[in-house]
């Protein structure tokens, strides 16, 4: 699109901004013969011819300019909305930043819980289980399964080899109403009650922001 606009500007400059040799030739043409009466008549005729030529050229150039603009707009890959994007660049950047900032809320404190507690942004007044947990040790997003608990035979290699595929992990999941099974690639927990994450010093889980 930018290339098309540059070509359009170059063509407009070439056709409409440079002096016309024909017009210069008319301006430099002698204004009449040696006789006094022929001079005034020649001047009037020459002026009328130049005015007519200018009017004709003006309409022709306007039509050519409209045609060039229409050709650009009719290109298959031309995005007509791009001009609006350029005009409202600053306002659009502001509108983009606003929702991003709105999605940058973190739980404080961070809670784990059983399936009876809803998930969401945890605060001191709104005790919800964080569902945007991430492990800073293995850099994995924490998965959780409602109404399940981990089998006691689970070990590090099991999660290392099977995360985050549920069809593989479910071989070590046991149904338990009210429980919630959490796991990353290096740690796992079964939780039934609302628990402050800071109380478990072995876990290196943090809220990944909502």
From Swiss-Prot:
Record has Cytoplasm as a keyword: yes
GO cellular component: ciliary base; cytoplasm; cytosol; photoreceptor inner segment
Residue numbers spanned by region Disordered: 24-59
Keyword Hydrolase in record: no
Taxonomic superkingdom: Eukaryota
UniProt cross-references to InterPro entries, sorted A to Z: CFAP418
Localization in the cell: Cytoplasm; Photoreceptor inner segment
Assigned keywords, A-Z: Cytoplasm
Location of the region described as Required for interaction with FAM161A in the Swiss-Prot/TrEMBL record: 1-77
Residue ranges of coiled coil: none
Basic and acidic residues composition-biased segments: 41-59
A Pfam family matched in the record: RMP
Entry's Gene Ontology BP terms: photoreceptor cell morphogenesis
Function: May be involved in photoreceptor outer segment disk morphogenesis.
Quaternary data: Interacts (via N-terminus) with FAM161A (via central region); the interaction is direct.
Identification of the protein by name: Cilia- and flagella-associated protein 418
Gene: Cfap418
């Amino acid at each position: 699109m930018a290339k098309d606009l540059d070509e359009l500007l170059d063509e407009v400059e070439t056709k409409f901004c440079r002096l016309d040799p024909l017009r210069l030739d008319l301006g430099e043409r002698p204004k009449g013969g040696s006789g006094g009466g022929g001079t005034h008549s020649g001047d009037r005729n020459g002026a009328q011819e130049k005015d007519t030529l200018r009017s004709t050229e003006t309409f022709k150039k306007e039509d050519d300019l409209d045609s060039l603009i229409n050709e650009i707009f009719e290109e298959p890959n031309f995005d007509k909305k791009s001009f609006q994007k350029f005009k409202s660049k600053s306002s659009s950047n502001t509108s983009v930043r606003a929702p991003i900032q709105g999605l940058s809320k973190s739980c404080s404190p961070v809670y784990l819980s059983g399936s009876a507690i809803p998930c969401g942004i945890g605060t001191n007044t709104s005790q919800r289980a964080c569902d945007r947990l991430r492990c800073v040790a293995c850099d994995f997003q924490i998965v959780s399964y409602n109404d399940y608990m981990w089998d006691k035979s689970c070990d590090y290699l099991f999660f290392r080899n099977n995360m985050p595929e549920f069809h593989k992990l479910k071989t070590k999941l046991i149904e338990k109403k009210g429980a919630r099974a959490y796991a990353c690639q290096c740690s796992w927990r079964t939780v039934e009650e609302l628990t402050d994450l800071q109380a478990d010093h072995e876990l290196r889980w943090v809220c990944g922001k909502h």
